[in-house]
Amino acid sequence: MTASRPKALQTFCLLLPLLVWMVDRSLCYKPVIVVHGLFDSSANFKNLLQYINESHPGTNVTVLDLFDNKESLQPLWKQVQGFKEAIYPIMQNAGRDGVHLLCYSQGGLICRGLLQTMPDHNVDTFISLSSPQMGQYGDTDYLRYLFPTYVKSNLYRLCYTQMGQTFSICNFWNDPHHHGIYVNVSDFLAPLNSERPEPNATDWKKNFLRLRKMVLIGGPDDGVITPWESSHFGFYDENETVLEMKYQMVYQDDTFGLRSMDYRGAITVYGVPGVVHTMWHSNQTVFKNCIEKWLT
């Protein structure tokens, strides 16, 4: 009886480092908060949840079930407020360790709204997955479904009105041929980018720069985000020639902290061909190559 005790103790001592390593691995993963896109819901992210659980077991992942499906057409500032109320307790529970934000499509703009308006957020890494960060200007199936009597060239007549700005898609509709109207009328993207005088611009920039890392993911075969380079903060000029992020006014003037983030090496950009818009969050190769390493 007494002879077996040293052996048991020896076995326990041998296993202890492995047990500690296993516990440490699950404890070191920051909580992940996922925000869905237009006409989406939490039900569409089962594959992503599986990928995270397989690669980082024990990670606390929350796919927020707010503004689902047609409710995702609600004005973006309203959605920002709703998501803020849901996210804040998760951030508080995470404490100093912080959280990661993984935001898809329209959700990427909602997350920017959160980041810029929350002075005490503790987001470590913001992953923007095929999100129109510089806006949208293109004839897509979504546009034809929502506004069947309009095309991209005349949608500004609806979007740049008080009624139009009650639709989320109009909040980031960025017509390069009517830029002046966009700047004056846009309720969301123009003030978020500080493209017009904004009384909160200094505070919003400071809040955004609390981020440690921003990851921008998009690709040429997306088929919805137009131009697709908007997912990388690129956009059309008045001739519909795409100018990359570094040639955008918001970067050159550092209106909300984009250039500052880039200068400190805090932005990583992935351009992935062969992925259509609705498959970004289900594509395992995208997860392995562009997302997994940032969720530690």
Swiss-Prot record:
InterPro entries: AB_hydrolase_fold. Its EC number is 3.1.2.2. The keyword Signal applies. Its main location: other. It holds the Pfam family Palm_thioest. The keyword Mitochondrion does not apply. It catalyses: hexadecanoyl-CoA + H2O = hexadecanoate + CoA + H(+); S-hexadecanoyl-N-acetylcysteamine + H2O = N-acetylcysteamine + hexadecanoate + H(+). Keywords: Disulfide bond, Glycoprotein, Hydrolase, Lysosome, Signal. Residues 1-28 form the signal peptide. GO terms for cellular component: extracellular region; lysosome. It is an enzyme of class 3 (hydrolase). One of its GO terms (molecular function) is fatty acyl-CoA hydrolase activity. Disulfide bonds join C103-C111, C159-C170. The active site is at S105 (nucleophile), D222, H277. Glycans are attached at N53, N60, N184, N200, N239, N283. It is found in: Lysosome. Belongs to the palmitoyl-protein thioesterase family. Catalyzes the cleavage of thioester bonds from S-palmitoyl-CoA or S-palmitoyl-N-acetylcysteamine (unbranched structures) but does not have activity against palmitoylcysteine or palmitoylated proteins, branched structures or bulky head groups. Conversely, hydrolyzes both long and short chain fatty acyl-CoA substrate. PANTHER family: LYSOSOMAL THIOESTERASE PPT2, PALMITOYL-PROTEIN THIOESTERASE/DOLICHYLDIPHOSPHATASE 1. This is Lysosomal thioesterase PPT2-A. It comes from Xenopus laevis (African clawed frog). The gene is ppt2-a.
